[in-house]
Amino acid sequence: MCIDLIRFELQQAAQILNQFMSDDKNLDPVRQAAFLLVDAFKAGKKVISCGNGGSHCDAMHFAEELTGRYRENRPGYPAIAISDVSHISCVGNDFGYEHVFSRYVDSVGCEGDVLFALSTSGNSKNIIKAIQSARQKKMKVIILTGQMGGAMSNLADVKICVPHQGYADRIQEIHIKIIHILILLIEQKMDINNESLTFLKEEGHV
């Protein structure tokens, strides 16, 4: 019984992943997002990431593997996840939860920076407000979303969307894989002397 359930869950996850990667229209925005981030880093700019719930954890995961390490040793890249509990509780209490991300973007965002905004529905009000603040700051915006992209669908420079209408966890499972691929692509473009990346170049994957 348990084994059957485990197998079913893995099969369903694999099916949704296969559906996503079978259409180049889903994959090309990942490439676009990586190039946009590389351009920002090379220009001395930073990325600010944000999300709610599981997407909040993904936003933190994205930032820590940029500032810290993914697979290879290399210089850290400037990334901040909006995850300071004191900031979130202060702004949530004094201004309302809808402002917890936008207030941070207003405070530290600069022209040319990138906002990496995650929402499985595309309708999170606090994420939309963060995007609006980023636009006012003349920042670039990448969204990582699901379903049909929601209300934020037309607010981004790059929209990466997992077009799945079911449970949010299935969307998030693909989101974390996209995040890892983004970091790999960034490393390829930022660190061309890395031996493993040189191998990828020789194999025609870069």
UniProtKB/Swiss-Prot annotation:
Task of the protein: Catalyzes the isomerization of sedoheptulose 7-phosphate in D-glycero-D-manno-heptose 7-phosphate.
Gene assigned in the entry: gmhA
GO molecular function, one term: D-sedoheptulose 7-phosphate isomerase activity
Record flagged with keyword Translocase: no
EC numbers, comma separated: 5.3.1.28
Residues covered by the SIS domain: 37-195
Family stated for the protein in its record: Belongs to the SIS family. GmhA subfamily.
Chief localization: cytoplasm
Subunit structure: Homotetramer.
Species per Swiss-Prot/TrEMBL record: Hamiltonella defensa subsp. Acyrthosiphon pisum (strain 5AT)
Gene Ontology biological-process annotations: carbohydrate metabolic process; D-glycero-D-manno-heptose 7-phosphate biosynthetic process
Subcellular location: Cytoplasm
Chain residues that bind substrate: N52, G53, G54, E65, N93, D94, S119, T120, S121, S124, Q172
Record's keyword terms, sorted: Carbohydrate metabolism, Cytoplasm, Isomerase, Metal-binding, Zinc
The protein's annotated pathway: Carbohydrate biosynthesis; D-glycero-D-manno-heptose 7-phosphate biosynthesis; D-glycero-alpha-D-manno-heptose 7-phosphate and D-glycero-beta-D-manno-heptose 7-phosphate from sedoheptulose 7-phosphate: step 1/1
This protein's record includes keyword Zinc: yes
Gene3D superfamilies reported for this sequence: Glucose-6-phosphate isomerase like protein, domain 1
Protein name (database record): Phosphoheptose isomerase
Entry's cofactor comment: Binds 1 zinc ion per subunit.
Annotated Zn(2+) binding sites: H61, E65, Q172, H180
Gene Ontology cellular-component terms listed: cytoplasm
